[in-house]
Structure formats: structure tokens, C-alpha cells
Amino acid sequence: MIVSGLSGSGKSVALKTFEDLDYYCSDNLPVELLPDFVKSRLRGNPIGDQRLAVGIDVRSRSDLTQLAQWRQAAQEYGIEARLLFFEASDEALIKRYADTRRRHPLSHLGLALPEAITRERQLTEPLRTQADAVIDTSTLNVHQLRRRVVTEFALGSHDRLSLLFESFAYKRGVPAEADFVFDARVLPNPHWDPELRPLTGRDAGVRDYLDNEADVQRYSAQIVDLLDTWLPRLRNDTRSYVTIAFGCTGGKHRSVYMAERMARHAREQGWPEVATFHREQD
């Protein structure tokens, strides 16, 4: 997966999302080094077993037009190299730079921010025209962008059902894209144990605490029964992906635990495309 686009448009968020899904990632890689990078990662490993994500942009200081030639050569060797291009409106980019107080990569040329954005659009146009998908992030927040990357690009082939298990805090709202929503607030709350309060549902202490609660076992078994019954039917209905969300008060303990537990069960059941996303933690 090749990730490119305008500075401030969400490329770093996309790369971090791929990394969280066990892609081997490299950012700011010059195009001329891309063939050697891919060869080094594939050496001794079947092509189908490797998931790579590479960030390429104006910082690469290389001839971006070379990318088309490399992608064509890679395809002949059975390597699928998809190019995602992230962009946003000038207004959105200017606001993001104002909020973060970061400098634009082209500011060293003595350009004001609007001029730097315009210049970057010109420099990256060869990449945009090659892109398999152009993603406008002007109206997306970080959580929405991560979810879109996971569901539309990171999980793989669309001829099979991809599962995303998500945790969230009810006080911040239910994820609009969720297909199934389960309320984990009925479960015992580790928050009230001072030793467990700083931890999350991914930590062993919280897992052990909840694993030993009878209500948690009963709750989990009933959800497993529901998902094992209906997810195969959704796959037969040609769905590409399903989001299963678990909510609790703070999105830190119970919801995270349940999302991780159900994702683990799905992998054990043989579902090939499974990911987790913890909205309040990631």
C-alpha cells in the first residue's frame, strides 16, 4: 500500500492505522529506493504473506513520476501496489496547521502557508493522477479517517467479509457506522478498583478481573452465539465489512476488553480479515 497526498491531509494517521493492523510501514521513502525496500521485505517470504505500507510525498525529494513505472513492473511480478492519495481543502489544511502550529514542509522555500499548499498540490499532481483512490479528509476527524482506512482499504479483499471490532465511550456518542452495538455498562466496572483504574481492557490485570466474573462469561457467550449465527449470513449477502461496537462509560475498560475478546474469537473461528479499533484509546 502506497500512502501519499498533501501535508496535513491525514497521511500519518493512515500509516499509523496500517501499522496497527500489522503492516510493515516506512514513511518518507524516496521513490528510487522503493524497489529495494520491497525486495528486502519479500526476501524469503511468500508475496501473499507480506503487508507493506509506504509513505511517499514531497519530502521524498525524488522524481514522483517514476512511481508509475515501478508499479507496472511490480504488477508483472504479482505484487499489488495500491496508491492512496489523501487531500483536503485549503481551508481545512490552513486550520489544521493553525491548530497544531506546525510548519509546512515547503515553508523553507520562503512561501506563505497558502502558497506552500498550492505549490504542494502542483508537485504531487503526478501521484494524484495515478491514485487508485483519492480520499478527501476535509470533513473527517481522526476517528472517522481511521475507520475509513480500516474498512475500505486496510483489511484487504472485498470478496470476503471484513470485521472491525470497535470500543467507544457512550459519553462521546455511539459510532454512526456501527452495524451491531452492545452495551458493556451492565458488566462489573474495573474502574472502581484503584489498581486497575489506570489500565485498559488490553492489560492483563483487567482481563483477569473480567474473565473471573460470571456475568461477563454469560454476556460474552450470548454475543458469541449471536455473531456466530448471523455473520455468515451477512457474508452470503455480499457485504464487504461489518463493524461491531462495544460501549461503556469511558471507553477504557469493559468496552475495550469485549472488543478484543470478540476479535480474538473471530480469528479463532477462521475469519481472515479482523481488526480492532479503540476510539477513545487509539
Curated annotation (Swiss-Prot):
Keywords: ATP-binding, GTP-binding, Nucleotide-binding. GO terms for molecular function: ATP binding; GTP binding. GTP binds at D57, V58, R59, S60. It holds the Pfam family PapZ_C. It comes from the Bacteria. InterPro entries: P-loop_NTPase, RapZ-like, RapZ-like_N, RapZ_C. ATP binds at G5, L6, S7, G8, S9, G10, K11, S12. The keyword GTP-binding applies. SUPFAM superfamilies: P-loop containing nucleoside triphosphate hydrolases. The keyword Nucleotide-binding applies. Displays ATPase and GTPase activities. Belongs to the RapZ-like family. This is Nucleotide-binding protein XCV3122.
